Amino acid sequence: GSIPCGESCVWIPCISSVVGCACKNKVCYKN
């Protein structure tokens, strides 16, 4: 939840979720 993954999730889910990123405030974050 603190490290930006450089991906947005406004229209599509986080592709980076495969490496532990999750959507938060329309941006993908890790931890």
Curated annotation (Swiss-Prot):
Keyword Disulfide bond: yes
One GO term of the biological process aspect: defense response
Keyword Disulfide bond attributed: yes
Name used for this protein in its record: Cyclotide mden-K
Stored InterPro entries: Cyclotide, Cyclotide_bracelet_CS, Cyclotide_sf
Keyword annotations from UniProtKB, A to Z: Disulfide bond, Plant defense
Domain of life: Eukaryota
PROSITE patterns referenced in this protein's UniProt entry, alphabetically: CYCLOTIDE (PS51052), CYCLOTIDE_BRACELET (PS60008)
Cross-link (Cyclopeptide (Gly-Asn)): 1-31
Record remark: domains: The presence of a 'disulfide through disulfide knot' structurally defines this protein as a knottin.
Species of the source: Melicytus dentatus (Tree violet)
Family: Belongs to the cyclotide family. Bracelet subfamily.
